Amino acid sequence: MTHLRKMMLEELQRRNYAETTIRSYIRIVEDFSQRFHRPPDRLDPQQIREYQAELFQKRKLAPSTVTVYLAALRFFYTKTLKKGWSVAETPYPKRAEHVPSILSQEEVARLIDAARTPFHRTLLMTLYATGVRRAELTHLKITDIDSQRMVVHIQGGKGRKDRDVMLSPKLLQELREHWRRLKRKPSEWLFPGHRHPTNDRPISTKVVWQACRNAAQRAGLQKQVHPHTLRHCFATHLLEQGADLRNIQVLLGLNDLEQTTIYLHVSERRLNATASPLDSLKLQEKSPQAE
């Protein structure tokens, strides 16, 4: 490990950055250094601008991805090297506005009913019922399901923020059936990786992607469907059912409209007053099946 890499790693860890962000930021700085065949502390804003242009023109990266690259470089120069950073010289790219693909409630029901396995069905139902991100889904623990308060506790979400989301009665029933289907009862993870004999590791996000893709194909859906699609559907369908926009914002674990670090918090009373859109779906009954 080089001295600069160690310095950056310590700065990231000291600020409690997520492991995925740490790996990404370090990889980006290493890529930047290799591009110019020089240590990153000997590169200046001119090289950063050339690198930014290359990311767009040659690598064809999306504006949101380029923003992550610049954020990594900015962290390295301002936090690790304690140097200045001129936003005017290296501005963040303007992000294109993309309208997310939204499924109707009927299409969501078709998607869930078309799940290849009961396990996949439970994953899809949990995504739609809670609006969680796929990484949050894979790291749900058994103890995160609070059937007394009817909430699901999300630990260490994006930005290392914890939050509670509503626990749909229909989802609670599905999770109990999921538990009964498991031949080996895990001690920690709600969705254990089946490839691990001891069930001591959670499933990968790849499994969640596969569950969505396979179900969409089996359901004959023409729209692009991925785990985040169900998160968008969760928010949109709640809004259509009259839920408060700020309440939805909290349930999703998003920043406020000004993109600050301040998070809104919802009271238990308001949380319980918001019904999950899963409860209004008409799903086919599935017979219990061991996993």
Language-model segments: residues:
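Conserved catalytic core of the tyrosine transesterase superfamily
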Residues: 1-291
